[in-house]
Amino acid sequence: MSKAIQIRMAGYGPSTTAFSKSLKFIGDRLEAELGDGVDVKYVWNIMDFGYRADDILWLVESGVLTLGYQSSSYLTDRAPELGFVDLPFLFANNDQARAAMDGALGKYLAQKIEERFNYRILGWFENGFRHISNRLRPVHTPADLAGMKIRVLPSDVQARTFQLLGAEPLKMDLTEAIERVVGGTVDAQENPLANTVTYGVHKFHRYHTLSNHFYISRPIFAHRDSVEGWPDELKDAMNRAVRDAVAYQRGLAEQEAVDSRKAIEDEGCEIVTLTAAEHAAFVKAVGPQHDDARETFGAEMFKLAGL
């Protein structure tokens, strides 16, 4: 490549997160393989520059940025098939979820995103299993959520989950969610432990329940027009870099979960580990969603997921 190709990668978290480190992993790989053929720059957290977290969607789609990531739930308005992976208690563990997202289900969902967005989907980062935190009381059963105002991702499926659990779900972007957690105008939120700590929620929420209610992925998307203009050498290098970065990010995320739990405990918070019976009560409460999903999404989606 005679002229350096600009690659602008961005996210919405500090440089210390698994996601930011994985973007750097991709950039380092590209520079190692292509040298002066690429000009790689990073914006770790677009919120530091006055953007909302969900602005990363249009920033990449318009080509202002080359590559980014976002939780799949943010894309459900234009790619409703992604609502399938918002279903509660869909996957039992990381291995099952990763097999689905790396396999037929992930390929199908990537195709649906590319049909509706000006993206090329390069892979899936792991946001992982999500847990409930709140400022009011310990949560052991759905009844403990009664009347709680809880921030959820912009997903109708996720909102219905918490309606069935008796809470009052409020769909909002991360930027607003952080403001409202700090201000106390929402009672609860749900996130992987790493996100809860990264955004300082554990300093305002004393009670944390390890509910594992959703498993969410973050598609890694690139500006399609840019990708299509790249030489094959860069396309191949990017695909290899992202493949390895996904494995790297998942390993980092596992350690982040351990470290984040300790940070929550060190803050003096209370962590609830559900008993088998308590967990079953949550699963039973949201059972109607799985019945409806077979009509909404079709049995084929469950087959693609290996379920």
Locations of regions flagged by a protein language model:
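N-terminal secretory/targeting leader peptides
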Residues: M1-D95, E114-E115, Y119-L307
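Hinge/lid segment of periplasmic solute-binding proteins
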Residues: D102-E115
